């Protein structure tokens, strides 16, 4: 389903942020500069309409709660995405293909969809504007159309039992929404909305065949974020988000797709299913947490090629770091090629209105209203991980995931957060590797590790971890050297039960140390192994690799290199956004060319200072009445006053629209590799050029007048 929105007046979906102190109240827009309507605002407006229906007796409170849920543990029956302009995906593609970033900057793009309005407060007694009351507000232009994806929660029993009744109520509530955003009583935010129940094409979630399954399998999954994703911190802080997707969330997704009974049968099988955490991924290369032992010199920069030489403190010689001030590298993730990968996050600002809905804003008082912020992982990023399962488990997982429709994950997934593409894209057989006996290895924890000691108590004692490792290797003489450890807290809040989860400490991901065995051990036994407890949720992933003796302490990492795009013809686009940007740039350059022309001919104006003001006023009058440069020229020729006639003729000869346009077109054709010039109708060109010209002339006249007064 889709919710279609048409703006019947300008709209401001306040973002809670300001831009460059020039805009006091800004709209919400994405990284490309394209404005959108956040789903939480949209859903709140639909909820208001449904509440009005309840108050009028059109629907009951029970029917209302079936659709919108109830505060606490009753979830909403539908999810909603942000509302984007029609043709959003194509516009984003055009902007990303544009290699001229000065042209397609977010502010330039935003200006195509918005404009700035000013407002002030007037003293009712004096009729004069209040001091310091001038405000600027950016608004989205009326006439634009938006669409938001709307999907039923297929796990919701009310949706299964009464699909038509619930759908009809939602349809009525959507159609009743008439205003969105701020200043609704001042002419902003008038909209027309409707629910389109046409089924949308579903994404394919499984790209592997069950025939390829072996006895033991390692299934690769990828998650592409279509909207921001909130992975709440285990500490339960909504103002923070994890920078990865925990295996427990993926396991929960699979459980929901299977159903409770089938999932319990899956867990009861002899082999334990394991779902690793999903980490940031670039070009199919999965990142993993970097070692805590990697350090750099204080204030050490990257070299010209984007590389940095680090020191691995696990086995460094004192002479190598003597007289050097070493600091942690603070690198979050690296891929197999040691390219640094980073996760982009953002903060969005929200408010909850009071329980008394006659109050249209949060007050900050104890009336049920509040202001709050949510941290999330930015949309457009990819994450990947692995599912370890035997043949029967893998087949059941594939069947369940194949039946998924629109996938949403994380906190706030019923509104603007958590829309993802989830795909099982490849599978490899897990089989024993050829034996490789070594004495020394480097152990790195790729996820948090939960440990229990022999008394069944939670612990972070590294000696307990050593016993887990010895059990896998089949030895009893491991010696741990030079540990670099960090400790994290696991906890959170169970929304379903309305209770806090147990809080305890774990050894954090990125922790690393050396292990030595006098007897020697097979390092390949650790391939695809997890240690500790709750490994099915992604905890306990480790990497054990042989310690190489030569130059082990030197580590070279590199920044992600920007892709070099070939410069294509900008005018080969799908949506027209690039053409709008080119026209805006053309207009800006026309105005600049007019300004430069006047600056070059200042002496002409200064020599006729005594009649310049009257000449400019005459030209402004003619400009209002005539629609072409030629008509203006004809009117100037008819001026009876000889001196004024000559000055006016001189002034309009300085700036000829066609000449200015030809000059700008030539420059833009060269700068942007255009195949054909930007063509405007003569009247439009005349209006833009002479509006700018007469404004500059008027400003120049005032400067001359002030200069004369001072003398």
Residues of each region from the PLM?
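Conserved active-site/ligand-binding neighborhood in enzyme cores
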Residues: 1-711
């Amino acid at each position: 389903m889709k919710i279609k929105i048409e703006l019947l007046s300008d709209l401001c979906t306040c973002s809670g942020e300001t831009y460059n102190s020039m805009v006091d109240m800004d709209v919400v827009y994405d990284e490309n500069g394209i404005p959108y309507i956040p789903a939480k605002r949209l859903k709140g407006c639909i909820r208001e309409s449904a509440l009005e229906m309840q108050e009028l007796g059109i629907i009951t409170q029970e029917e209302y709660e079936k659709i919108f849920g109830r505060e606490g543990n009753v979830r909403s029956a539908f999810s909603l995405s942000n509302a984007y302009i029609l043709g959003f995906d194509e516009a984003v593609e055009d902007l990303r293909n544009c290699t001229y970033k000065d042209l397609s900057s977010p502010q330039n793009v935003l200006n195509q969809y918005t404009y700035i309005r000013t407002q002030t407060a007037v003293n009712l007694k004096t009729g004069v504007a209040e001091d310091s009351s001038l405000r600027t507000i950016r608004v989205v232009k009326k006439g634009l159309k938006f669409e938001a994806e709307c999907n039923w929660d297929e796990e919701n029993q009310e949706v299964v039992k009464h699909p038509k009744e619930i759908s009809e109520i939602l349809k009525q509530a959507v159609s009743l929404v008439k205003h969105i955003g701020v200043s609704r009583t001042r002419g902003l935010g008038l909209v027309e909305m409707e629910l389109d129940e046409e089924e949308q094409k579903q994404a394919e979630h499984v790209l592997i065949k069950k025939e390829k399954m072996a006895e033991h399998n390692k299934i690769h999954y990828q998650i592409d974020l279509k909207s921001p994703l909130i992975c709440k911190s285990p500490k339960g802080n909504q103002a923070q988000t994890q920078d990865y997707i925990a295996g427990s969330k993926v396991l929960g997704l699979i459980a929901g797709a299977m159903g409770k009974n089938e999932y319990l049968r899956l867990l009861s099988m002899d082999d334990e299913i394991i779902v690793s955490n999903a980490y940031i991924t670039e070009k199919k290369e999965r990142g993993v947490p970097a070692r805590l032992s990697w350090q750099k010199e204080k204030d050490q920069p990257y070299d010209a090629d984007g590389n940095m030489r680090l020191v691995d403190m696990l086995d460094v010689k004192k002479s190598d770091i003597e007289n050097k001030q070493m600091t942690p590298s603070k690198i979050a993730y690296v891929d197999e090629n040691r390219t640094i990968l980073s996760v982009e996050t953002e903060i969005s600002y929200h408010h909850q209105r009071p329980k008394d809905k006659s109050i249209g804003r949060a007050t900050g008082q104890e009336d049920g209203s509040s202001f709050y912020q949510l941290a999330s992982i930015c949309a457009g990023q990819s994450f990947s991980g692995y599912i370890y399962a035997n043949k029967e488990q893998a087949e059941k997982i594939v069947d369940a995931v194949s039946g998924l429709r629109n996938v949403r994950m994380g906190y706030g997934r019923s509104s603007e957060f958590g829309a993802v593409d989830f795909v099982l894209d490849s599978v490899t057989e897990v089989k024993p590797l050829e034996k490789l006996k070594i004495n020394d290895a480097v152990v790195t924890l790729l996820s948090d590790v939960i440990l229990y000691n022999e008394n069944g108590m939670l612990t972070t004692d590294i000696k307990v971890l050593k016993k887990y490792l010895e059990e896998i290797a089949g030895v009893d003489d491991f010696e741990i050297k030079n540990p670099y450890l960090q400790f994290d807290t696991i906890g959170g809040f169970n929304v379903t039960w309305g209770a806090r989860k147990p809080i305890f400490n774990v050894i954090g991901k990125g922790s690393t140390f050396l292990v030595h065995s006098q007897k020697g051990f097979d390092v390949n036994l650790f391939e695809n192994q997890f240690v500790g407890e709750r490994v099915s949720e992604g905890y306990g992933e480790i990497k054990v690799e042989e310690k190489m003796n030569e130059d082990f302490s030197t580590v070279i990492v590199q920044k992600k290199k920007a892709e070099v795009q070939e410069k294509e013809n900008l005018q080969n686009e799908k949506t027209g956004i690039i053409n709008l940007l080119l026209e805006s740039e053309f207009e800006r350059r026309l105005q600049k060319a007019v300004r430069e022309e006047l600056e070059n001919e200042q002496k002409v104006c200064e020599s006729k200072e005594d009649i310049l003001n009257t000449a400019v006023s005459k030209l402004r009058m003619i400009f209002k009445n005539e629609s072409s440069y030629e008509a203006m020229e004809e009117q100037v020729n008819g001026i009876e006053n000889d001196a004024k006639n000559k000055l006016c003729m001189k002034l309009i000869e300085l700036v000829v629209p066609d000449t200015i346009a030809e000059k700008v077109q030539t420059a833009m054709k060269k700068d942007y590799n255009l195949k054909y010039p930007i063509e405007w109708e003569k009247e439009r060109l005349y209006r833009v050029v002479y509006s700018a010209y007469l404004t500059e002339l008027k400003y120049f006249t005032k400067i001359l007048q002030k200069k004369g007064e001072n003398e």
